[in-house]
């Protein structure tokens, strides 16, 4: 029987609990009495992480606990235990954790439309009427929509949907009907696109203005009014969690890469290959509302549908829930690292009868030295192979037994990465290991942090095997057996979410440990991780260079052309030339390099890391370095900036080479999409053709570029500090200046009813203009389209746009390999 929580909050005296027992939703107000701990000389089952013997005490209610702590800490009497009483209550109720059943969780997707003929509708003011609302719950197959004009679901252009439309006389009746529906179907989770900072605060503020504040109580399972956050931008509705899908995408959608824009239209296209409903035949959304209400409502429904479909494909909401339940914490903590790790560690320690202490105040806030990034050997290199350390920071924690209770008080003087690389002899004390800062860690006991990381790794390995087994089972089930396939697919989804949750949790551990607000923050441990990481990667560099110099009988050649944190790039062109001087078959060369990597370099590195373990007296050897890519050609232009023509990646041989791009403008969200595409094509030419082919393509690209709409060639940017008082031209970012000019021209030409003005936080585009022009400046911005009424299209400086967005990044690469962007005239050309 499923038993799990969906929301746990508190008032001064009560815990407000929402969850499920079996198929039944449970809503409870609990008078909770927390447990604290105090030092004792008596025999006890409890101790702190640093060995203090403690025993339980229950002063009474949460308010009583607060008073008890204040009175006793004033006399320097130490009190232990978790003062986050929500976390303590969840742990009391679910000591062994719990798993969410997504078939029970009610997720409501929501989207609203607001009258926008007088500029952008500011949620905090909510001055303009709401003109449409659509909601779709995960436990109901119907889209419920409210509007003030005509709409026929039968002829809706939004396909594959069941729509129930409520036509209302006015906004008052619309909001009243919506509140009634919401009250009868209060969700566990509300989600939408930017719903946390727009849709929900606008709805709350508008209901208060139109229906009265008392109606807001109907939005909460506990009858509470929504609470505004400190910044005045978002509301908390007691009993319901808001998981804004835009924020989820930014947090969890890293596999989709950097985005030109985080507007729904772009992200839906990236994830689904689908877009918002196009209404470009109308001048604005306000015009669409006035002139085609049927399509206006379709537009509203479509937005809601897109977010729901993205969740169906990505499972980000399900993943956020799995991640939170992994730590026994509320869903909103899945967005961060400090809180979720604090709660996770608390639950692990609690199961071992280890009591947490209060964090000591942090004095000072000096910057932690980071990872090692080598200045690369710039230029073009043939036959490059990269090697990657597996999850470096978590494995360093395990290898050096780094944990709050294993940090030794002593530091060995004269220890740094350089001295360790020379293999100077250090007398490491017995039962200690030496980190690269000189900080010692005890090895006579297994640290809690390394234990936690190891358990997570083992758990993820088991879960991945379960997922693989379930996938194999699915292949054996007939496609006609829909019920059985559904059950197995549900298992696969569960296992995938579980293993991804563990991966995300592990990857966020160092982020928490290096944060001064983390309960277990200690700069000695945080810096020992990063600097020991520096030694680890440079240890590999040293060993690889020694091997290749001996093999190729070269003096002191640097074959490691680049290093970035946990990976290094080795140039093997000289080795290929020596062993296979006449070979032109790339597949054969690739197989040779793969053999060298797997049979020579990887075993060499394994031995090197075993030697390092003995040298620093590490708790255990956890460093594993494996071959990643084999590229026929690589061009480095600087740190973290390169392109590679990849033939094989982690053992997967590609049928045709794949382009890998890091740090180059083609993967930057600030580069226009059309230029990113042009840059990508050019990069492939650089890696596979010659200088003349690249020059011909650049010339052709410039000609085509000049025929594109301005909306395609303008720079995408996010705009902030729009209203910051700065003298024009002095310290004002160019895109902000462009946005101000756009707003000025909209007002100057009385176009407010047709075009929305740009607001702080908006994603915009801007372009250079030739002077003179009607705008009287050299740049103009716009949210979606450049208004024809501005009469500026004919002044767009296409040459400037082309040079800045396409040619300059390409020229940086060509300069690194001594190629020119256009053919250079020679004496032979001059004399014919």
Regions found by a protein language model. Give the residues of each.
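C-terminal, non-catalytic extensions of nucleic-acid polymerases
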Residues: 594, 598, 602-832
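Proline-aspartate-enriched helix->loop->beta-strand connector
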Residues: 178-202
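Catalytic palm subdomain of template-directed nucleic-acid polymerases
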Residues: 568-599
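Glycine- and acidic
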Residues: 159-165, 184-189, 288-295, 326, ...
């Amino acid at each position: 029987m499923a038993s799990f929580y969906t929301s746990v909050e508190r008032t001064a005296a009560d815990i407000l609990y929402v969850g499920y027992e079996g198929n039944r939703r449970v809503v409870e107000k609990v008078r909770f009495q927390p447990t604290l701990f105090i030092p004792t000389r008596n025999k006890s089952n409890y101790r702190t992480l640093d060995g203090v013997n403690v025993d339980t005490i229950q002063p009474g209610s949460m308010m009583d606990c607060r008073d008890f702590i204040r009175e006793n800490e004033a006399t320097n009497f130490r009190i232990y235990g978790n003062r986050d009483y929500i976390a303590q209550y969840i742990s009391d109720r679910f000591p062994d954790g719990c798993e969410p059943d997504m078939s029970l969780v009610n997720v409501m997707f929501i989207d609203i439309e607001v009258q926008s003929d007088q500029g952008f509708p500011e949620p905090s003011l909510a001055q303009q009427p709401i003109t449409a609302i659509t909601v779709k719950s995960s436990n109901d197959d119907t889209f419920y929509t409210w509007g003030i004009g005509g709409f026929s679901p039968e002829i809706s252009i939004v396909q594959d949907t069941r729509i129930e439309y409520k036509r209302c006389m006015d906004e008052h009746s619309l909001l009243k009907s919506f509140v009634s529906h919401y009250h009868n179907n209060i969700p566990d989770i509300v989600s939408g696109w930017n719903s946390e900072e727009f849709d929900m605060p606008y709805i709350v503020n508008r209901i208060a203005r139109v229906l009265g504040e008392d109606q807001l109580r109907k939005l909460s399972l506990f009858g509470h009014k929504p609470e505004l956050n400190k910044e005045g931008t978002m509301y908390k509705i007691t009993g319901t969690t808001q998981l804004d899908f835009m924020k989820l995408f930014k947090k969890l959608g890293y596999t989709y890469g950097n985005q030109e824009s985080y507007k729904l239209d772009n992200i839906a296209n990236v994830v689904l290959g689908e877009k918002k409903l196009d209404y470009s035949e109308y001048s604005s959304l306000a015009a669409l509302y006035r002139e085609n209400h049927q399509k206006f409502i379709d537009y509203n429904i479509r937005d809601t549908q897109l977010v729901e479909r993205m969740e169906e494909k990505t499972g980000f909401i399900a993943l956020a829930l799995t991640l939170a339940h992994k730590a026994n914490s509320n869903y909103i903590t899945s967005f961060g690292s400090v809180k979720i790790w604090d709660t996770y560690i608390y639950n692990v320690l609690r199961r071992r009868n280890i009591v947490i202490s209060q964090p000591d105040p942090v004095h000072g806030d000096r910057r932690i030295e980071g990872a090692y990034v080598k200045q690369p050997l710039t230029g073009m290199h043939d036959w490059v192979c990269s090697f990657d350390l597996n999850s470096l920071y978590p494995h360093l924690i395990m290898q050096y037994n780094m944990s709050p209770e294993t940090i030794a008080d002593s530091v060995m003087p004269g220890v740094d990465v350089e001295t360790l690389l020379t293999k100077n002899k250090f007398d490491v004390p017995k039962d200690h290991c030496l980190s690269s800062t000189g900080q010692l860690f005890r090895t006579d006991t297994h640290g809690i942090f390394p234990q936690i990381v190891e358990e997570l790794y083992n758990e993820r390995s088991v879960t991945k095997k379960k997922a693989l087994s379930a996938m194999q089972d699915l292949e054996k089930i007939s496609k006609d057996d829909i019920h059985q396939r559904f059950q197995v697919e549900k298992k696969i989804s569960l296992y995938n979410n579980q293993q991804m949750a563990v991966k995300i949790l592990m990857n966020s551990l160092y982020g928490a440990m290096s944060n001064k607000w983390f309960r277990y923050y200690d700069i000695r441990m945080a810096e020992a991780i990063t600097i020991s990481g520096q030694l680890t990667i440079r240890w590999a560099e040293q060993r690889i260079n020694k091997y290749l110099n001996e093999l190729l009988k070269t003096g002191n050649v640097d074959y490691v052309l680049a290093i970035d944190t946990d990976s290094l790039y080795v140039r093997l062109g000289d080795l290929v030339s020596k062993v296979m001087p006449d070979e032109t078959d790339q597949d054969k060369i690739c197989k040779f390099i793969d053999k060298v990597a797997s049979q020579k370099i990887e075993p060499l590195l394994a031995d090197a890391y075993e030697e390092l373990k003995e040298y620093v007296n590490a708790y255990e050897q956890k460093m594993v370095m494996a071959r990643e890519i084999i590229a026929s050609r690589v061009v480095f232009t600087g740190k973290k900036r390169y392109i590679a023509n990849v033939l094989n990646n982690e053992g997967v041989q590609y049928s045709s080479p794949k382009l890998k791009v890091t740090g180059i403008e083609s993967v930057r969200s600030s580069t226009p999409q059309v230029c990113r595409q042009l840059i990508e094509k050019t990069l492939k030419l650089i890696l596979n053709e010659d200088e003349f082919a690249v020059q011909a393509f650049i010339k052709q690209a410039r000609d085509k570029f000049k025929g594109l709409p301005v909306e395609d060639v303008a720079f995408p940017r996010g705009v902030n500090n729009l209203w910051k008082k700065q003298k024009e031209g002095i310290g004002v970012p160019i895109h902000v200046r462009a946005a101000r000019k756009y707003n000025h021209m909209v007002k100057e030409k009385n176009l407010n009813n047709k075009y929305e003005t740009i607001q702080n936080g908006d994603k915009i585009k801007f372009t250079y203009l030739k002077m003179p022009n009607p705008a009287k400046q050299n740049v103009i911005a716009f949210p979606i389209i450049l208004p024809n009424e501005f009469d500026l299209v004919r002044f767009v400086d296409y040459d400037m746009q082309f040079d800045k967005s396409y040619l300059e990044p390409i020229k940086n690469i060509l300069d690194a390999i001594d190629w020119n962007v256009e053919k250079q005239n020679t004496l032979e050309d001059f004399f014919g």
